[in-house]
Amino acid sequence: RITAAGPACARSRALAGTTVPAPAEPDLAAAPGWAQARRQLAAFLTGRLAAAAGARTVHPVHAERGPGPGRDPSQAMGPVAAAIEYAGAGAIRYALARVPPGAPARVDPCHEAARRLDVPAYAVRYAHAHAASTLRQAADLGLNRGEAAEFGPRPLAHPSEQVLLDELSWLPERVAGAARQARPDVFPRYLERLAGAYFGCQERCPAVWPGMGTGGPEISARLWLAAAAATALRAGLDLLGVDAPDRL
């Protein structure tokens, strides 16, 4: 169902009947400092997640105003703009999105630019890219997932596969829960658990591997699982406004 739903796999009606403020998307590079950038992004993401969970959103009359439509080139570059220029908009946006209320909002651009799995933004995006690569490799090998109507989770019996299935099943509720609490920072952390579950599953139960022979029901099921993981991770990153590259 996740693969068939595409980006809508993260949506639900959990907050139907509620109304939530939805400020305009902030220009993070124009923010004078980290604290303001985090506040503006958190307010925006709360509204965005709430809308995905079925809430009615309204533009607040007294929304916090940013410094304008963009940074004045004649002014010195602020810390957020400098970090975005160094590490990329997606990495900095993700790092800010996961900062909880009350915690220091400062982000280390050198850390966020690193291509390591202990960097949360990179780990989640790499998990998506790995799943997309798995599907490309399967296609190159002539392996077919089969029809969606024929898929059943029965072959996915390994504990690591069950963990990934469980994490995937919570996606819409994690979106709604983050919006309900006005804590968008908890949603990136869910995506990190999902990425970790995917890596654990691929380490123990890979869908493709060098020298593999023909497929079968088990391989088809694993390919569907990889496709579901790729779809869910992309949907989650899209909600955060972070790109989900197919190759890293």
Language model features: what each stretch is:
Residues 1-248:
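Non-catalytic interaction-recognition regions
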